[in-house]
């Protein structure tokens, strides 16, 4: 029997059943989130991100993630690196491209729960996409083995602007920790607390950002080494609204 492809898999799978099987806490709500991204963002995701941050802001976000991914302990030349909640691959491709110059033999993987985003990811070179939820990365990998070669563990995991879409961030941190190798690291970039409640309708946000101290305390329950910093000078600007960002570095 020929091996199925991601495209074939996405056509055949019944999404609510798969989400339930992966242990999504509220599969119905998550399916609604996925519909939001499919109908409102998938085709124009890259333009949306660019309009929020601008080229300078995007560069600062990418460079901030790279600096921490390149921090000690250094990634090996054959590192396996995963982007969780990669969306269309806007940040994945930029970070992978720069890391490839330093780690030419590294492998890059991208996980997302929106089929339309994954189809966009398939167009990105040298990145292996697969379906999954951040709360159960290990289970998502097991499912993905039917159509892609995905390792069980990674040297590094990163995410950009994904966490505020997750209902249980503690479970996400635990999920990330489970797929990191010994001495592995994770880098998470997301929004600080803000008051723009309209983001929930406009962008399908679950959380109105996070207090960096909250992130630190929650992550420390899972990771022995946690650093959370605000990213000065980087704001998400849209219609005059500005939200600060933070970057969390988590080490096993």
Language-model region placement:
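Conserved class I S-adenosyl-L-methionine
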Residues: 2-74, 90-94, 120, 136
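Class I SAM-dependent methyltransferase SAM/SAH-binding core
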Residues: 80-144
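A conserved beta-strand element that flanks and buttresses the S-adenosyl-L-methionine
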Residues: 158
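Short catalytic micro-motifs in class I SAM-dependent methyltransferases
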Residues: 161-162
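A short glycine-rich, Lys/Arg-flanked "PGG" loop and its adjoining helix->strand segment in the class I
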Residues: 170-182
């Amino acid at each position: 029997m020929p091996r199925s492809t991601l495209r074939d898999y996405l056509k055949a799978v019944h999404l609510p059943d798969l989400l339930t099987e992966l242990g999504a806490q509220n599969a119905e709500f998550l399916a609604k989130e996925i519909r939001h991204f499919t109908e409102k963002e998938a085709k124009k995701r890259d333009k949306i991100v660019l309009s929020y941050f601008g080229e300078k802001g995007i560069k600062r976000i990418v460079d901030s993630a790279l600096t921490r991914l390149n921090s000690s302990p250094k990634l090996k030349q054959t590192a396996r690196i995963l982007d969780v909640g990669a969306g269309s691959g806007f940040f994945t491709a930029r970070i992978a491209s720069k890391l490839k110059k330093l780690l030419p033999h590294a492998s890059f993987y991208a996980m997302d729960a929106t089929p339309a985003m994954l189809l966009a990811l398939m167009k990105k070179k040298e990145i292996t996409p697969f379906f999954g939820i951040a709360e159960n990365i290990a289970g998502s990998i097991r499912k993905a083995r039917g159509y892609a070669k995905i390792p069980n563990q990674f040297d590094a995991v990163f995410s950009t602007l994904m966490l505020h879409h997750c209902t249980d961030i503690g479970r996400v941190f635990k999920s990330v920790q489970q797929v990191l190798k010994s001495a592995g690291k994770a880098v998470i970039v997301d929004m600080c607390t803000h008051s723009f409640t309209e983001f929930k309708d406009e962008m399908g946000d679950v959380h109105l950002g996070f207090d960096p101290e909250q992130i630190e305390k929650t992550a420390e329950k899972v990771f022995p080494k946690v650093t959370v910093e605000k990213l000065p000078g980087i704001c998400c600007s849209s219609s005059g609204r500005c939200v600060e960002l933070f970057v969390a570095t988590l080490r096993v």
